[in-house]
Amino acid sequence: MALMRIRSFVLILPCLALLVLCAGAPPALGDTDLETPQQLFQDLFAAVQDAQIFSDGKSFVDAVPNSAPNLILQEFRAQRPESKEALAQFVAAHFTMPSSAYAAPSPPQQVPLLEHIDRLWDELTRRTPTAPTYSSLLPLPQAYVVPGGRFREIYYWDSYFTMLGLGDAGRSDLIDGMVSDFAYFIDTFAHVPNGARTYYLSRSQPPFFFAMVGLLSPQDPAAAYARFLPELRREHAFWMEGEKDIRAGHAHRRVVALADGSILNRYWDDSDAPRDESYREDTLLARSSGRPPQQLYRDIRAAAESGWDFGSRWFADGHSRATLETTSIVPVDLNSLVYGMELAIRDGCERNGDAACADEFKRHAMQRRAAINRYLWDASGTYFDYRWTQRQRVPRVSAATVYPLFVRLASSRQAHAVAATVRARLLAPGGVVTTPTATGEQWDAPNGWAPVQWITVAGLGNYGESALAQTIACRWLSNVEAVYQRTGKLVEKYDVMDLGKKGGGGEYPAQDGFGWTNGVTRRLLKLYPDPARCARELSALPRS
């Protein structure tokens, strides 16, 4: 019966219709209901992934078993299919394969880009108050927008950028529902998982929940923060778990105590096993890396929590995935977002008349700001990540340097210095490049991503760098339009060095859809509606 409780929201939907979240406790969850496909299917799982029955390992972990996992496993062990063909037949007989989140292209000559984006919202919307029995999918009470392609479930940080466009499209219903879904996750699991799958529960993603909540009441965000204060505080507790007992120079889960006792955060994952969705890639890398496998798996998973999986930011040698050191890094973006979360909690506490809480979180935020300035700010005009295990900054420029501007942490002097760094090191013909380093990884050159563009444009705008912000926006819009004119699609990532091309690299082919690209592009089309200006930006660029 526990399985039925986790898989259905039928009983709680009436109260969700009246309130954003039910006042009572969420449905009871049994531990066995939350086992991942790797845990459920054991040697069958390893055999399927190692044999590469599917070109994308995520296909198998998203498949729905046709009967109880223990019975399927027993039958597998009895039959022991030895050939790849026999194993594929066994899988086909015992599992129902998932479909992709298809986003139909439009003929660009007939459908303008903005109209195409608005057509896609319904195509990418899912409602899963129940999930198939034994599925890895986590059901959610409200409708939500998925990114698209292989990403057929809701994702944490993607959703903030998707919501930007939903708001401009008049889809406040979806924003309200998605915020409620994330609040439900926090109330149920004490954090927002990477995505709505059992195999994502051991990690989160960049904590944008406070920013999503702010979208509910743009003119008075404190009112929304007050409404969701329990969830904001619970998520903060998740990221800060262990801070009170940690000694200087040590780390525990997501908190790091630096040499002077300052507390900052890192990315982490509670599992040190290969990822379910990328099992084969992880085990092959471990075999060739010469590193203890569990240590490498933890750093792989922590990079997945960062959302930047993968890129040179996390590589000890700057170019090889085998040298991943994510858990040794105190990142600029994460600590900026936790600072923003702390200010949001302060504002919510003030609105609720809780002065002690407001003072506490103001103090947390000010201490974090001081530590960021002490450890991450560099006189060259850049915020760098910090390698806490060696007490040194990592002197590599990345678009993460703009996050302190996004949450208004930087001073005016720092912000204008960062703007100069963006102009000199990151500005490209098609927008902002993620890093200037070309490694073949998807979070490096020549790729640009929608979230990077928005964080940069919004951050620069916070400090009066409007001309540079508009240049970036126009270049991004021109690039998105060029790909749309050629393909009729919006995609996950773009080549910002060579206009009109999709981005490449990574563990899987470029995906269409695409939630956060749609959201950011639609918001930028509203903020910068002058096509003539963007045309001038494009015409001034050198042709390859």
Residue ranges and their predicted role:
Residues I12-A23:
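Bacterial N-terminal signal peptides
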Residues L21-D31:
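Bacterial Sec-dependent signal peptides at the C-terminal "C-region" and cleavage site
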Residues L40, A47-E153, G177-V192, A196, ...:
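Extended glycan-interaction surfaces of carbohydrate-active proteins
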Residues Y155-F185, A400-S411, Q453-S466:
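Alpha-helical support elements that line or immediately flank enzyme active sites
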Residues I186-F228, Q511:
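Aromatic/His-enriched, Gly/Pro-containing loop or helix-boundary segments
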Residues L216-R227, I345-E360, Y463:
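Inter-helical turn/loop segments and adjacent helix faces that build the functional surface
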Residues T327-N352, P446-W454, G459-Y463, A467:
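Long, repeat-rich segments with strong aromatic
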